[in-house]
């Protein structure tokens, strides 16, 4: 878990999915982000390369069929830390042999929190 802070906020970020886990208002002593529940355990997932469910859980590109899970795969992958300071953090996910099995494109997805 990564943490960045300002005078007003404390923010926790998961490396898996580069997901915000907590946004805590230090001035009011209050959590500002949904903390999960029985029906939806995530807080603020990064959805890439698709949002939602594809019909049949797949799509076609250049006459080839590719499987795709609900909301894509970014939230299921560990992002690399590019840079992390006291008050900011940049995380990155790049294509791999595994991601190209369901998304046959080169990509670099960066999430930056300040």
Predicted stretch roles:
Residues 1-114:
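Surface-exposed acidic/polar loop and edge beta-strand patches at domain peripheries
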